[in-house]
């Protein structure tokens, strides 16, 4: 999965897909009442990027729905969306409410109330383990609205670079048993080692691990891309999807990896 990083403006959806992204990551900021408000990152952000691009959340999600509905030219090119949920502005007790409001919003504006809406898989990426009730609030809301089947298209990620064992315990608390992606990484302005990504891959590949897929961010340089592929990840989050595509076509990688398609299930652990 080639995950276009910080796609917060409607025009950027096309831009990143045209460069080779089959997935995008979008930042979601919340208002004081825990409503998803903007697709916005703000400063500071990755080196070489404009941190201030934004849309109203509802507008972005409607445009995303159009792009990921059968009949659109991007439909079979873009099929995974990571919502990077900026819950740091919320009190811990608001996490469940944020999940409820996000679910209602996506049900209406993205899934079109289950009536031929957007078809992409969605990952809820949460920066704080304490906010695990966002997941339960989200799940209970979709079930309560009579759309439990839409949870088949929803996965989860904790993005705070916490200890993998702690992450697994929180999933147990939240009752999550699958659809788990694990991110690791740091802004492209800094270097980060592979110790934790290796631990995440080991959990993914162990019999009793909870992780299904692992991705690393933000991978922009050619050598870092090679090192990341050598760590056996499933996804690369990048500001330059075309560089990821270029490296995947190198002799060392083109027989070992392939770019994911709409037919690939992002919740299935890949077994060699």
UniProtKB/Swiss-Prot annotation:
Lineage per the UniProt record: Eukaryota, Metazoa, Ecdysozoa, Arthropoda, Chelicerata
Active site location: 5, 41
InterPro entries named among the record's database cross-references: PLC-like_Pdiesterase_TIM-brl
Any one Gene Ontology BP term: lipid catabolic process
Cofactor comment: Binds 1 Mg(2+) ion per subunit.
Residues annotated to bind Mg(2+): 25, 27, 84
SUPFAM superfamilies according to UniProt: PLC-like phosphodiesterases
Coiled coil: none
Top EC category: lyase
Catalytic reaction equation(s): an N-(acyl)-sphingosylphosphocholine = an N-(acyl)-sphingosyl-1,3-cyclic phosphate + choline; an N-(acyl)-sphingosylphosphoethanolamine = an N-(acyl)-sphingosyl-1,3-cyclic phosphate + ethanolamine; a 1-acyl-sn-glycero-3-phosphocholine = a 1-acyl-sn-glycero-2,3-cyclic phosphate + choline; a 1-acyl-sn-glycero-3-phosphoethanolamine = a 1-acyl-sn-glycero-2,3-cyclic phosphate + ethanolamine
Bridged cysteine pairs (disulfide): 45-51, 47-189
EC number of the protein: 4.6.1.-
Cofactor(s) this protein cannot do without: Mg(2+)
Protein localization: Secreted
Tissue specificity remark: Expressed by the venom gland.
CDD domains: GDPD_like_SMaseD_PLD (cd08576)
GO cellular component, one term: extracellular region
Annotated protein name in UniProt: Dermonecrotic toxin LvSicTox-alphaIC1bv
Family statement drawn from the similarity comment of this UniProt entry: Belongs to the arthropod phospholipase D family. Class II subfamily.
